[in-house]
Amino acid sequence: CGADTFIRVGTCGGMQPEVKSGDIVIATGAIRMEGTSREYAPIEFPAVPDLTVTNALVDAAQKKGYPFHTGVVQCKDSFYGQHEPEAKPVGYELLNKWEAWKKLGCLASEMESAALFVGASCLKVRVGSCFLVLANQEREKLGLENPVVHDTDMAVQVAVEAVRNLIRTDGKKKE
């Protein structure tokens, strides 16, 4: 017994110009640029959330009328790796990967989802992730508005509404 469904609620940094501070990002997959998930599955195994949980998060964000984006997020170990990468010994690698992820449409950068998605696959449980965008350094580079937003209330509300939806749909399946 125990929990069978998990939702990670947190913060991220935007990577695409259309992803604004205060928006919600719902992950549909995570780039495994961290170390934890490699201890559970080969790097070729994708880090993806449960579709039912992800759809519940999308439905909740739509119901609340919050601005949101769905897509791939970058999951990394270093909180400040993307800030002034040229000052770091592996700056060339950080810069090249950051640019590649942007070109591939990666929406945001965060630190937990890949490990959670792979771990959930191993444990045969459901997981999803939603984030509040704190800021977006790419918008700043383009001279676009980029206020820093720390109020995670919208992301929490999306997760709570998603849990309500999952409880309802799971209950109907048992009937």
Regions found by a protein language model. Give the residues of each.
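Glycine-rich phosphate- or other oxyanion-binding loops that anchor nucleotides, phosphorylated ligands
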Residues: 1-175
